[in-house]
Design a protein with these regions (language model features):
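Structured mid-to-C-terminal alpha-helical surface segments
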Residues: 1-154
Length: 154
């Protein structure tokens, strides 16, 4: 398991809406790439509705950058479950979990079908669009013989 983050933390200020309500604040936080990579692994593995909600926004607004993909690869190879079990996991039924634990948590209403589509889009973006050198590296790690000079920004 990975202890820490792939990228350095960054300083962030609160949004204007939070500042208006609570006042100014600035804090050191995990990088966007590390946060998003963790959300992606969570969405693929645990399939938490919050992660699908966030991934939906990520894909619509920022996409999968090289920095994010590198962090994702680092998190995948340090994950406690086999990569194949995470990357090829069948989507569980989200309707019951949505009604029980997600409805009312967000200002924006997103139905189950949209979150299921986020899963499909995520698999296409993270796995389908993965560069060949990244694929070869993941396969070599899975075989227990890491090869290549894939720079993960560590």
């Amino acid at each position: 398991m990975l202890c820490g983050c792939v990228n350095d933390p960054v300083d962030r200020t609160v949004t204007p809406a939070v500042e208006a309500e609570c006042g100014f604040a600035e804090i050191q936080v995990i990088s966007f790439a590390d946060l998003s990579a963790g959300k992606i692994v969570g969405a693929l593995d645990s399939q938490h509705l919050r992660d699908f909600f966030d991934v939906r926004h990520l894909l619509a607004n920022d996409g999968i950058t090289l920095e994010l993909r590198s962090a994702f690869i680092a998190y995948m190879i340090s994950h406690n479950r086999p990569m194949a079990a995470v990357l090829d996991r069948r989507l569980k039924n989200l309707a019951e979990e949505s009604a029980r634990g997600f409805v009312g948590m967000t200002v924006e209403t997103v139905d189950v079908a949209e979150r299921e589509k986020a899963h499909t889009d995520l698999v296409a973006a993270v796995i389908g669009d993965m560069q060949q050198d990244h694929r070869r590296f993941l396969v070599s790690v899975q075989k227990g013989q890491p090869t290549g000079a894939l720079a993960l920004g560590c």
